[in-house]
Amino acid sequence: MENSHINESILSEEILEDQKKNRIDHMTYLPGMEDIGSDVMDQVISAMNAYDYEKYTEVDVRRAIAHDIRTPEDFAALLSPAALPLLEEIAQAAQAETRKHFGNSVYMFTPIYIANYCENYCIYCGFNCHNKINRAQLNEEEIEKEMAAIAKTGLQEILILTGESRSKSTVEYIGNACKIARKYFKVIGLEIYPVNSDEYAFLHECGADYVTVFQETYNSDKYETLHLAGHKRIFPYRVNAQERAVKGGMRGVGFGALLGLDDFRKDAFATGYHAYLLQRKYPHAEIAFSCPRLRPIINNDRINPMDVHEPQLLQVVCAYRLFMPFASITVSTRECARVRDNLVNIAATKISAGVSTGIGSHVDDIEDKGDDQFEISDERSVDEVYDALLKNNLQPVMSDYIYV
């Protein structure tokens, strides 16, 4: 799938030509990037390239549904087109698996965007370095104000996000944000640019519990056409980020492809298989999935997940649940309230609330506010999401961790 609408640039031809002349090899590590010598990426890419989802039949899908423990081959069948007519049965099996391992619990959190400076040129992202948006970075006093305001809502888990700029959002800056967060929250996640294992160790010491890294797409050729400049262009460094995070002591790692960038079935398969391999290699690591679809961004409203409709999204979420029954699954505010409520009733176990993707959006007295990364569809407050969960006979959980 080409998705030519994604490749329509918002830049001038002159800038594009300059970028092309100076483009670096996306498969070669840059100086300072840690190579951990892992073979996980090669296994994932090999399996994804061999994945022919058209070969699976209804018999294969029913066999996968019936199994108590699903193999990668079962996972492949559950993601195939042959599974769509059986989506109701798959959803019922996924719901049963969710209740078995999580009961009615749904974990609540919110993201906090502390900076939106970025050094990458990813043509589908609102933060990309050539997009003319308002840039901002919170100082420590502003971070504390934002976090104090969020904590008053009752939330006990926070996800700290920055744009991917090492020069603006240094590892030390992010570490200080983690230390501030530890005053207010029991669980702290990070969604930042990938770093080396010793830097993940430093951030863990500062209070971070888990790291989420979106690979966006596992098709390295497509990846190269979407990430034209910056450190994010280096494909293998990003693929191996979760393993470096585990080596650095992080308790959990999250995986996600941006569904709609490329062939979503292959990307979903690669995402699940990547997590599966790391779970087998590091049994102690907590695994999480996020399932975002493309959304329009500032200055480019043509970006949409053209072939990933709600049934396909449900199929992916349920396949993750059946393949990795203990994994946490988050559904983004990129989805509307109805879709999110349905998914947490079936297979998702984590939901964000009171979300803003802008900088300094939780308090009124921060003057230098930055623009949003993407458009959100579910703008409900913490109380509204909490009440919606209760109405669906689900139990909102703020945290299940106690630090001693």
Can you say where each PLM-predicted feature lies in the sequence?
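Auxiliary Fe-S-binding modules of radical SAM enzymes
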Residues: 1-83, 280-404
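An N-cap/entry alpha-helix motif that binds or orients negatively charged groups
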Residues: 69-106
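Conserved, mostly hydrophobic/aromatic
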Residues: 94, 122, 160, 213, ...
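Generic structural signal for well-ordered alpha-helices
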Residues: 95, 110, 147, 174-178, ...
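Canonical Radical SAM [4Fe-4S] cluster-binding loop centered on the CxxxCxxC motif
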Residues: 102-103, 107-142
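Short, small-residue-enriched loops and turns at beta-alpha junctions
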Residues: 116, 164-169, 259-264, 298, ...
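Core AdoMet radical
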Residues: 129-144, 150-246, 251-255, 259-261, ...
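Catalytic cores of alpha/beta
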Residues: 196-205, 262-276, 336-346
